[in-house]
Amino acid sequence: MKFPSLRLAAAACSLVVAATVAGCATGDDAVAQGGTFVFVSPGGKTELFYDPPSDRGAVGKVSGEDLMTDGKTTSLTDYEGQVVVLNVWGQWCGPCRGEADDLEKVYENTKDMGVQFLGINVRDHTKDKAQDFVVNNKVGYPSIYDPEMRTLLTLGKNYPTSVIPTTIVLDRQHRVAAVFLKELLVEDLQPVVERVAQEPQDQG
């Protein structure tokens, strides 16, 4: 698949950072310690899949201040029994801007399948700028406001906080089914989300 230069640069950046951060994961050596997801070295991969479902690890208690609504807390537990797509982003991040339309399309195409998207906005210490990003890009799903990246620590041991954007697909038990350490297109993400959404709910 051919990518514009921005997408190539983003993927290359993810590869370099992921290779140097000891906390990334691969589909071959993902580990679940006590049922908890742990990132391990990605070996240069930017698309990581975890099968069978019984081998998947769960993320922690993802929760934080809602980006768009003052005084509201948004949590992963708000979406019990749903497939959840977590996207870590910042308005300052070029690849995040590049993938915004694609993420929104996948969200619209899959939400009737019991799929929810949840953003985690990081390193934006001016909240208004992050809110403008949501409005200008017509993002229809919520985001947690996490300028200090504290929420990221709940995503798994050794989470690679340097890799932005990152997208994590959680199954209906909120275990990690896939991780993307790169900017995404519809054709990258939608087939994976649909496959996970179609898994038997008692699988694993």
Say what each PLM segment does.
Residues 1-65, 199, 203-204:
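N-terminal targeting signals for export/organelle localization
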Residues 60, 84, 164-165:
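Short loop/turn microsegments at loop-to-beta-strand junctions
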Residues 66-68, 170-171:
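Short, acidic, Ser/Thr-enriched surface-loop or helix-capping motifs
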Residues 74-97, 103, 117:
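Short active-site neighborhood of thiol/selenol oxidoreductases, capturing the structured segment around
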Residues 88-90, 120-123, 146-147, 182-183:
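Active-site-proximal beta-strand/loop segments in catalytic clefts of secreted hydrolases
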Residues 97-137, 148-154:
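Structural microenvironment flanking redox-active thiols in thiol-disulfide oxidoreductases
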Residues 132-140, 146-201:
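Thiol/disulfide oxidoreductase modules built on the thioredoxin-like
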